[in-house]
Structure formats: structure tokens, C-alpha cells
Amino acid sequence: MRTHLLSITALALTAFGAVPAAAQVNGVGVTDPAIAIAGSQALQAAYTQIGTTYQAQRTQLEQLQGQRDALLRQFDTDGDGQMNEAEQQAAQANATVIQQMQALDQTIQQTQAPIQLARIYAIEQIAMQYGNAVQQVVAANNVSLILSPGSVVYAADAVDLTDEIIARLNTLVPTVSASAPAGWQPQRQSVTLFQEVQQLLLSAAVQQQQQQAAPAQAPVQGR
């Protein structure tokens, strides 16, 4: 998990097509709240603690997902590991399988709930300081405009502010609680941020797997 989190800022530089803030400052910056929050030390520590606290639930989730995958494999007639339209229709026509999958999905959702709530709570605490971190970076770099990745079509001179914002977050909120209070309900923006962070983690994990697999797939030379 820590490796995935640390890979996120590298992904950000590629996605933005921007240079680090230390390289130049021209008044235009680019950053993304989810990437900055995901790269903060507080979230890395919180995710690690949450993973330890809910290790039993994570193990149960792996088992439940394995049971669900086994049900679907019954209908994977071509053995490609994917469910095409015909195979999906065959599975949906089997009432017993549908009932079993619905029961598994409900159990998976219930098991995931406390883990997700703890992660969202950690993210929300950091997000509360994100605005302050941005303001400090803006003042330090004389930035007049900050763009999000989704709003950038082309910006040759854009400055990536992500690393500086992460550094400010590390100072403003070095640690957060990884346990949500009883009855706590997250803000809608926090749920959205959580979903974005999870997608970033998935992308970082996929990229890491591809990089690790690349040497093994490289052709043998000199023979």
C-alpha cells in the first residue's frame, strides 16, 4: 500500500504534462486534491493502520470475492477469465446462482463498510487542511492561477504544484485519526475524494505490476 501511495505523484507528473514547481514559476499551477491527499504522510500512515486494524475483515473479503469468482467461473465456457455477453446471460438465467451472488454481494458490502468509513474519515481530516496548504503554496510561488487536470487541454508552461502541496499538508496535518467516531457521517465531497483516491491507488498498483512484469517478458539477447 505504501508503495502504491508513493507512486501517485509520479503518475501525476505524467498525467499533467507539467514540470515540478522548483523548475520554474510563471503564475500558472496544476494540481489535483486527490493526488495531493493520497501522497500525504498522514494518509499513508492512516491506511497502514486501518489495514492492520481490519486485517480479519480484509482476509474475509478475499475469501468472499474468491467465492463470487468461483460462481462466475462456472459460466466462463471459453475459459478466458472474462464474462462475455452470452456467459453473463447464462449466469443471470440461473436463479440459484443469482441468489448466491446477491447474498455474497451484500456480505461483501457489509464487510467493506467499516474499512471504507475509516478511510473516508482519514481523507476528510486531511482535506480540511487542503485549502490552507494551497494558499501557502500560492503565496510562496506567486501563483495566480491553479488548474485541475480535467481543465487542462494544453499548458506548456504549467507548474506542477503537487509535491509542494503535499509538503505543506505534511506540516499542517502530520497525523490523523484512523477511527471514525460513533455515528459519524462523511461529507459528500469526502466520499468523492475517497473514490478518486482509490482509483489512483488502483492505477498505481497496475502500473507497478506492469513494470515488474516487463523484465520477465524482455527477450533474451546474445544467444
Where do the model's predicted regions map?
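Hydrophobic helical h-region of N-terminal Sec-dependent signal peptides
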Residues: 9-13
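Hydrophobic alpha-helical membrane context
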Residues: 15-16, 44
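Amphipathic, charged alpha-helical segments and their helix-to-coil junctions
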Residues: 22-223
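N-terminal signal peptide c-region/cleavage motif recognized by signal peptidases
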Residues: 18-20
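Bacterial N-terminal signal peptides that target proteins for export
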Residues: 1-8
